[in-house]
Curated annotation (Swiss-Prot):
Homology family: Belongs to the phenylalanyl-tRNA synthetase beta subunit family. Type 1 subfamily.
Class in the EC hierarchy, top level: ligase
Coiled-coil regions, chain positions: none
Swiss-Prot/TrEMBL keywords: Aminoacyl-tRNA synthetase, ATP-binding, Cytoplasm, Ligase, Magnesium, Metal-binding, Nucleotide-binding, Protein biosynthesis, RNA-binding, tRNA-binding
UniProt keyword annotation of Protein biosynthesis present: yes
GO MF terms, alphabetically ordered: ATP binding; catalytic activity, acting on a protein; magnesium ion binding; phenylalanine-tRNA ligase activity; transferase activity; tRNA binding
Pfam families referenced in this protein's UniProt entry, alphabetically: B3_4, B5, FDX-ACB, tRNA_bind, tRNA_synthFbeta
Protein name in the entry: Phenylalanine--tRNA ligase beta subunit
Length: 801
């Protein structure tokens, strides 16, 4: 949120410096990112009046005689297409500084002396995105009343100071100038004074021209007004200045009024050309799958049923809460305007704007919340401004569907509750003073008091919120500080802390680097790599659409990190994270999710770089699986791997489920190529393991065995098998053969190709036998091998090679 200090001082009497104000606001709850002055670095820029303007033959140049308040006219050569006689312009005289610290000097252009430069706003350092359309390809034209020789800074409000606020979701009330004014007034104990407009309505009723119908529960309220006989023209300079200093491009007086009201009230508005409507009934409804709409930016949007649209005669004319449609755009010939002020479901707007990658000032405010109390007032204010700036005639009444609660919210607490939480000894009088500054009504006594919270502060709902407001306005610096009291105790690690340390040791020993990713993600990514379907826990007031749901896997966030690095030429990555995921089996609005500790890692690129002796070695499934095996060897747990084809985001032929005592605790494998393409990453292998389940196994008592003094005996066996037979199937057949002295099974070769029939493969195993109490004889080992061979033949149809 960009706040003009000049504009702010029109709303509340504050006479401190912007540096002091920024410090005070940051310490009371709204962080200030910085303060900038548009005129910083600029100098010697004055108003010039073009007395004459002659075209230079065979060039695009113009030779201008300019009055800059000096005794003589100043000759300036200008190439702008919109320069002409009789206009007031910005002139940088010799010695002036413009953008990028460029110094203007006297010079000659095509042999003609030029004593300065006629400037565009771009040349003063203003962003192309906020410059009025009429001046985007030429020089800025100043108001007719500008006096030659005067500094241009005050005419364009370039001497203003712009305060950039970082608004958190809980303080969306500060996404308006009135909201910021209320905050500043509370901090300094001042009163706000807001401009009021005198709205004069015609006898003709708006309800006789249009009607409004709501057909979606995502639309809480929809209001419309009609203003006829408007004259569409550029906005006055003061209005353009306010919009540009807030980061918004001026378009024309009608559109600019809606944006001005958005900045003033925080109420998004839209203006339709009524004459372009194909009907008289405005319908707010869900879009239909496959429905299309060309928005104001000229893009054709494919809509889905989750989107909201405003429709007339069953044809969409606006993407509700996000952007208007091109078919009803306000143009220079528009005469009758329909103003819209509505309240849409924030979650729906967030999903639509995120899906279409179409963020706007309106959508961000709908996502975070709207002040119900000023929707109607904002509409009337906009209509009055069109009456004033566009000569419009306002038809009588608003056409409204849907009722919004506007009464204050009652929140009660006690003085004891407040003082206990803050460690203070505040009196009821102190509390009254705080809420008087905030503009909240309070009644009651020290035993119990009730605060009437106006609708503009929809973030306050419980007594803890009242305590926060008291602390903010009373002053955090005034709260007493005490050292914590606790007896000295012998500390020890919890079982989870010990497990984390052991996992971290294995991971870093394998060359993995630890990272920390966001616990918040999109609803789609939240469940992307989940092994079981659970409900999604979404935030009510997310800061951004990309951080709106609690993750149920760590892999998706890790792939975002890999994509970020790969895009910056860092393509050999081995990273891990130990963090929580949030599984929700109940109602996300009523039940807390279950927090599950996980260990996740991702590998991409090369394991070993190419050198003069060896070839480059890329990451593969077995390298990733080896890290998992090393972990469980360290943890002294036996796990099995079973081929997994059910994870949509994982490669069906290179993914395995990890089982501990028959229970699924994770997976390891290659990210599906299509998923990798979506993330714009190369071939990547990942694993995610449930540490919470492992922790319960770690708490079991260990059983130690004596080290035997008798040697082990090994035998190799090679098998010809169908390709569909898995390693797990073979190990299971060997283990269930009834051989008690078998201590180890190790796969050391897999082959398919020449001399092997199509559809078959060769797998070779090393089997280890040992008797802890005696030496094994060859005859005993031979019997064991016979049993194993028989089991393999019967259970997996193996052929001994």
């Amino acid at each position: 949120m960009l706040v003009s200090y000049k504009w702010l001082k029109e709303l509340v009497d504050v006479d401190v410096t912007t540096a002091e104000l920024a410090e005070k606001m940051s310490t009371t709850g709204i962080e200030v990112e910085g303060v900038e002055t548009p005129a910083e670095g600029l100098s010697k820029l004055v108003v010039g009046h073009i007395v004459s303007c002659e075209d230079v033959p065979d060039t695009y140049l113009h030779l201008c005689q300019v009055d800059t308040g000096d005794d003589e006219l100043r000759q300036v050569v200008c190439g702008a297409p919109n320069v002409k006689t009789g206009i007031n312009v910005i002139v940088a005289v010799p010695g002036a500084r413009i953008a990028d610290n460029y110094k203007i000097k006297k010079g000659k252009i095509r042999g003609m002396e030029s004593l300065g430069m006629i400037c565009s706003l771009q040349e003063l350092g203003l962003s192309e995105s906020i410059i009025p359309k009429e001046f985007s390809d030429g020089i800025q034209i100043l108001p007719e009343g500008a006096i030659p020789g005067d500094s241009i800074f005050s005419y364009l409000d370039l001497d203003d100071e712009i305060i950039e606020l970082s608004i958190t979701p809980n303080r969306a009330d500060a996404l308006s100038m009135r909201g910021v004014a209320h905050e500043v007034a509370a901090i300094y104990g001042k009163k706000v004074h807001f401009e009021e407009k005198n709205l004069i309505e015609e006898a003709e009723r708006a309800a006789d021209k249009i009607s409004v119908v709501i057909e979606s529960d995502k639309v809480l309220s929809y209001s419309a007004r009609i203003v006829k006989n408007v004259t569409v023209a550029p906005s006055p300079q003061w209005l353009q200045n306010k919009l540009m200093n807030a980061g918004i491009r001026p378009i024309n007086n009608v559109v600019d009024v809606t944006n001005y009201v958005l900045l003033t009230y925080g109420q998004p508005m839209h203006a339709f050309d009524f004459d372009k409507f194909d009907g008289t009934t405005i319908v707010a409804r869900n879009a239909e799958n496959g429905e299309k709409l060309i928005t104001l930016d000229g893009e054709e949007r494919d809509l889905i049923a989750d989107d909201l649209v405003i429709a007339v005669n069953d044809q969409p004319v606006a993407l509700a809460g996000v952007m208007g449609g091109q078919s009803t755009e306000i143009g220079s010939s528009s005469k009758t305007v329909v103003l819209e002020a509505a309240v849409f479901n924030g979650t729906s707007i967030r999903k639509t704007s995120g899906r279409l990658n179409l963020r706007s000032e309106s959508s961000s405010r709908f996502e975070k919340g709207i002040n119900y109390d000023t929707v109607s007032e904002a509409m009337d204010f906009a209509a009055a401004m069109l009456q004033e700036l566009a000569g419009g005639q306002v038809l009588s009444g608003q056409v409204t569907e849907g009722v919004l609660p506007t009464e204050p919210v009652e929140v009660s607490t006690t003085l004891g509750y407040v003082n206990t939480r803050l460690g203070t000894e505040l009196t009821y009088t102190d509390i009254e003073e705080v809420f008087e500054k905030l503009g909240f009504a309070i009644s009651g006594s020290e035993v119990k008091f009730t605060v009437l919270v106006p609708r503009r502060r929809w973030d306050i709902a419980i007594q803890a919120d009242l305590v926060e407001e008291i602390a903010r306005i009373y002053g955090y610096e005034k709260l007493p500080t005490t050292l914590p009291e606790a007896g000295a105790t012998a500390g020890e690690l919890t079982s989870m802390q010990r497990l984390r340390r052991r996992v971290r040791t294995v991971a870093e020993g394998a060359g993995l680097s630890e990272i920390i990713t966001y616990a918040l993600t999109t609803p789609e990514k939240a469940v992307q790599f989940s092994t079981q379907a659970t409900n999604i826990t979404e935030l009510m007031w997310p800061m951004t659409v990309d951080r709106s749901a609690l993750r149920q896997n760590v892999v998706s966030g890790m792939l975002d990190t890999i994509a970020y690095n790969v895009a910056r030429k860092n393509s050999n990555l081995a990273v891990y994270e130990i963090g929580k995921v949030f599984e929700q089996t109940g109602n996300p609005k009523e039940d807390l999710p279950t927090e599950v500790e996980t260990f996740t890692f991702a590998l991409t690129g090369l394991v070993e770089e190419k050198d003069f002796q060896t070839k480059a070695k890329p990451v593969d499934f077995f390298y990733a699986k080896g890290i998992v095996e090393a972990l469980f060897i360290k943890l002294k747990l036996d796990v099995t791997f079973v081929a997994q084809k059910g994870l949509a985001s994982m490669h069906p032929g290179r993914t395995a489920t990890i089982l501990l005592d028959g229970k699924e605790i994770g997976f390891v494998g290659q990210v599906h190529p299509q998923t990798a393409k979506q993330y714009d990453i190369p071939e990547t292998y990942v694993a995610e393991i449930n540490l919470s389940t492992i922790e319960s196994q770690m708490n079991q008592a260990l059983i130690f065995e004596d080290i035997t003094k008798y040697p082990s005996v090994s035998r190799d066996i090679a098998l010809l098998l169908a390709e569909s037979v898995s390693h797990h199937d073979i190990v299971s057949a060997i283990e269930t053969s009834g051989v008690k002295r078998l201590t180890a099974i190790k796969l050391f070769d897999v082959y398919a190709g020449n001399n092997i029939a199509e559809g078959y493969k060769s797998m070779a195993y090393s089997l280890t036998f040992q008797n802890p109490n005696d030496n094994l004889t060859d005859e005993e080992v031979a019997k064991y091998m016979e049993k194993i061979t028989k089991s393999l033949v019967e259970k997996v149809n193996a052929e001994i090679r």
